């Protein structure tokens, strides 16, 4: 059903010239993956068989279907790079009253999809940052001693929930995890999760917007007043868009 809906939607977009290699090039987001992107590209080729740049009508395709190796994890990798650069900047660290030892820091993550999974994997394995809280739509887990990303991922895929997870405390209302004490809070799910209703309760010193628009305007005003530093989404999660551009260039240059 998903394939039928995706292909039909793509057909209607293409027939109306709403997507093409030179205009409105889609990429994966919540609920989609490289599979859906491949279906869209396939429909474009069927409707425009003589367009030699047809593969560039969409990015985030599988590597074996004119995609780019590394695109899947690019957004999470980009957030990791931004966090690293922040901790290399003495002036910014002074503002949030943190030292430059990233490996001694803790973080809480909201969202365990493509971006959240890869980001938490990179931060914990490469930079030794401790993941102490993990929030999903149907509950979260907390362990101040750290959470193993791969173990948590396997459990969530199998059970579709963190309930009864053996190596951390289950938190039914995962939004409460946003208020827990940590050095870095990373919302990587949906928009408007930090608003005027809960911004005053945020205790993290640094917030990194891995999701698009996770902080509302009024919520941001409260965070500014409380001197909580926010790395905005337009910078923090730009890794995916950057690598999508590389894929697009690869396609139009053949």
Give the residues covered by each predicted segment.
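Structural motif
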Residues: 108, 184-186, 208
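Structural signal for hydrophobic packing residues in well-ordered secondary-structure cores
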Residues: 3-21, 41-52, 83-91, 114, ...
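Conserved active-site and cofactor/substrate-binding residues in soluble primary-metabolism enzymes
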Residues: 4, 8, 31-35, 39, ...
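Adenosine-phosphate binding glycine-rich loop
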Residues: 86, 201, 205-254
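Glycine-rich phosphate/diphosphate-binding loop of Rossmann-like nucleotide-binding domains
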Residues: 62, 66-179
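Glycine/serine-rich phosphate-binding loop and adjoining beta1-alpha1 elements at the start
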Residues: 1-103
